[in-house]
Amino acid sequence: MSNPEKAKNFDLMAFIGRNSKEIRWPEIKASAQELKKKYSKVGAIGYCYGGWACLKLAAEPSLIDAVSTAHPSLLDKAEIDAVKQPVQILAPENDFAYTEELKKYTLDTLPKTGVSWEYIYFPGLQHGFAARGDPNDPKQKEGLERAKRAGVNFLAGYLH
């Protein structure tokens, strides 16, 4: 969040309560279904909160053709297990949400799915780097730019 005043007053737990998976998944799924009616190929990029949704989409081939996520949050092992479409994960070194345990699980599990996947590690960067990294900090700026290029290139490979 770029506005320090809003960031200070942001109540994460209230946000998650108002936007739980149970509340938002039906809306996300319906949106993907509508897009698939209009377009032959559909992709999704989800940063942070959108990460779990991308992996749930990737479990349903009729909904999506490929997904990319950076520093996913609220992700669980079952969502990783269920992947059936190409997935890209952009993982910072330091992430309270996409934990070391989940990173290891991802790297152990995705090769067994038979699905095309890509995992890109961003050393020295934190959760949120791809969405709200500091463009005035050279390391964070590089991460922002690299993540953007990686996501676009990954999806372009599956959507054209």
Regions found by a protein language model. Give the residues of each.
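N-terminal cap/leader regions of alpha/beta-hydrolase-fold enzymes
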Residues: M1-H160
